[in-house]
Swiss-Prot record:
Highest taxon of the lineage: Bacteria
Position of the signal peptide: none
Biological processes annotated in GO: error-free translesion synthesis
InterPro entries noted in UniProt: ApaG_domain, ApaG_sf, Uncharacterised_ApaG
Family matches, as PROSITE patterns: APAG (PS51087)
Ranges where the ApaG domain occurs: 3-127
Protein name: Protein ApaG
Residues that span the membrane, as ranges: none
Pfam families: DUF525 (PF04379)
């Protein structure tokens, strides 16, 4: 698991390879990831938007922006947590994701919190001899 804390808000990411959805012979590798956001701060916050930077093993970078996460803009009171799962396809057997969430505090001011960088790696990648 990968974790980062910004302004008392902890973001933890747990990636996992989705072998059933992947087709390595077609250069299609799919990962899921589970994100847990814990509000350890003293104020109520709302997740407004997300930004992801996804880099594959060839250095190709894809940027993803959008409002909320999985169709929601959750509000977290102090001590609350929120969890969601999503996925990411790549054309290479490894990559890296990193990002940030745009949050809004009780006073309406917006601020960013870090999503930790995490690696996407095929477990036990098989090697073939020609």
């Amino acid at each position: 698991m990968y974790s980062a804390v910004t302004r008392g808000i902890e973001v933890t990411v747990e990636p996992f390879y989705l072998e059933v959805q992947s087709e390595p012979e077609e250069n299609r590798y799919v990962w899921g990831y589970r994100v847990t956001i814990v509000n350890n701060s003293s104020e109520t916050v709302q997740l407004c938007s997300r930004y992801w930077q996804i880099t594959d093993a060839n250095g190709h970078v894809q940027e993803v922006r959008g409002s909320g996460v999985v169709g929601e803009q959750p509000v977290l009171d102090p001590g609350d947590s929120y969890q969601y799962s999503s996925g990411c396809p790549l054309t290479t057997s490894s990559g890296v994701m990193v990002g940030r969430y745009q949050m809004k505090g009780e006073d309406g001011a917006q601020f960013e919190i870090e999503i930790p960088a995490f690696s996407l790696d095929v477990p036990e990648q098989r090697r073939t001899l020609n």
